[in-house]
Amino acid sequence: MITLTPGHLTLPQLRQIAREPVQLTLDPASFAKIDAGAKAVSDIAAKGEPAYGINTGFGRLASTHIPHDQLELLQKNLVLSHAVGVGEPMARSSVRLLIALKLSSLGRGHSGIRREVMDALIKLFNADVLPLIPVKGSVGASGDLAPLAHMSAVLLGVGEVFIRGERASAVDGLRVAGLAPLTLQAKEGLALLNGTQASTALALDNLFAIEDLYRTALVAGALSVDAAAGSVKPFDARIHELRGHRGQIDAAAAYRELLEGSAINLSHRDCGKVQDPYSLRCQPQVMGACLDQMRHAADVLLVEANAVSDNPLIFPDTGEVLSGGNFHAEPVAFAADNLALAAAEIGALAERRIALLIDATLSGLPPFLVKDGGVNSGFMIAHVTAAALASENKTLAHPASVDSLPTSANQEDHVSMATFAARKLADIADNTKHILAIELLAAAQGVDLRENETSPKLAEVMKTIRSKVAHYELDHYFAPDIAVIAKLVVERAFAKHCPFAFASEQ
């Protein structure tokens, strides 16, 4: 059970919510603020004075006053009319994060929503009844309206859910969770819909996947150093201290630890080769830059995870209702775009190491890593697959945040495209996962072909690979080998061997 303290979520909590079947409860210390916000909205509605989002229309229709007897209908219509998403359902892990983030935002007491509504979301979450949310349809301002409308519609008994993974109607989902359809009161529909929780949830979910890939890439890169008989001298701490970038220093330390005690490395320490190619030698510089970007993105996303991104905002202590733009997801878009650059570069560098290993003139290994070349093609086309995926990632890494299209009759004339920025991270991560799987197979093949042993830490990695895929002797149906190693990548079977850990794993 995780106790959500609104405004104080941590990265380890968020990773746990996304990855583990934990249940949620709300910190009772937040109840007074939630109740005060709800009362403030009720008082404003009773007075009848125009207040945006409480008794007016929305967007371009904000100047339209809504009579008191139509306020509940206004909220219902808002939810139903905004539930216009298309595409595949959002991943289960992202939906779990989305609900947790929405609860945190609402729980800070500036949205004017009743605890009854929040309790319903918690009951759905804990019963493993998750709204079916189409993943496409948000431009990241005014908040993630369409995705959050699909979440909210379930509370009204409209739409679809997944009950313990099985697709069902919202009515059935409410029944399983022990709930009846809700009637939303003034501002509650808007409070549920307005916010950056969909884009932030998608970005966080993919951040955690990319963190796992990063650690796997450090392991794969170290194994490739031994497979190519590369030098460990470029990882000397003194080099990296002189430059001073934290990520570079940390990455170099990981490579040193992974390669410590390698007999392969000791066997060629005094050879005549002066410098390795950049894909081996500059790993700390490239992977360090990726690490710095990822850490910055994590910091931004954690701030956003704890933010109140509703509009308008209620200040119960003064009774004020302030309209602003906290729903604009530009920080999330920038963070996701930076993550895309890092994830694509992780895959691009791995692809270059695969190319090095299969090139006999660079690696000193048999061409395409197979002894009887000619009749056997070995890793020739596996590298082509890696190249195709790396190239695709370069297109996917184009920043979504540089685009904007005006919506709502030009009232919402600049938007962030944060949801697409966050969503396409999943495709980049999937491509990078497969590139790393190919590199791990190629590097293991290269280490097998060396006379000496790799380091003790990397020997454990070799055991993991060889427990699933045998040494490549003759050409065979290769795709299943890549698939089984890619599955191990997702299961963090290689990441666990990395001496480095992220803040979300603490």
Swiss-Prot record:
One of its GO terms (molecular function) is histidine ammonia-lyase activity. Its EC number is 4.3.1.3. Pathway: Amino-acid degradation; L-histidine degradation into L-glutamate; N-formimidoyl-L-glutamate from L-histidine: step 1/3. GO terms for biological process: L-histidine catabolic process to glutamate and formamide; L-histidine catabolic process to glutamate and formate. It comes from the Bacteria. GO terms for cellular component: cytoplasm. Its main location: cytoplasm. It catalyses: L-histidine = trans-urocanate + NH4(+). Contains an active site 4-methylidene-imidazol-5-one (MIO), which is formed autocatalytically by cyclization and dehydration of residues Ala-Ser-Gly. It is found in: Cytoplasm. There is a cross-link at A141-G143 (5-imidazolinone (Ala-Gly)). The keyword Cytoplasm applies. InterPro entries: Aromatic_Lyase, Fumarase/histidase_N, HutH, L-Aspartase-like, Phe/His_NH3-lyase_AS. It holds the Pfam family Lyase_aromatic. Keywords: Cytoplasm, Histidine metabolism, Lyase. It is an enzyme of class 4 (lyase). The modification 2,3-didehydroalanine (Ser) is found at S142. Belongs to the PAL/histidase family. This is Histidine ammonia-lyase.
